[in-house]
Amino acid sequence: MKEYFVYEIKNKEVYDDFIQYMLEHSDFFSVIYFRNRKDSPLNKYLKEYKKILRPYILHAENTRKWPNTETWNGRSVYRIAFYYADMKCYDVLTRVNDIFEWHYPRAPMDLCFYKNGYCWFALTAHEEMAYLYTNNEKEIQELRELGVMVEFSEDNARLFHYDLEKEMNHYRTKILNKKL
């Protein structure tokens, strides 16, 4: 798979077009809800995002690893939440002005998009690093035409895969076993 570095999304209009494109061409997306400690509540901004996105939730779990990020901080809580890529999510995903605003405390962290279980847009907002993973030159050209500035980074990039169906089946089994 080819990796492309996203080095600029010129303005809010381009950002909004990018979000629309990603929602239309992805199966699901993820964000990270951060808390300083297990006993810390989510802040008001994160609660609002979570409430608005609740109808589109697929799965959520605490994690230490997500696309292009791994944390060793054992005290903080990172909860990855996966949502259907539905155009009804457009308004909440375009509340921020730029991809690098997907960062605590004003928004959930690290918005990522997935296709066929693979992350094809990975964001590490606090490091201002964003990558697209695709072998489809047409997708890259369409994004460039929207004003997304990308450059080829490498061939044979390692991809983050999330088997959402497996996780959802595991979750269903866990709930059924609790009821027995």
Predicted segments with their positions:
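Structured alpha/beta or helical-core interaction and ligand-binding surfaces enriched in interleaved
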Residues: 1-180
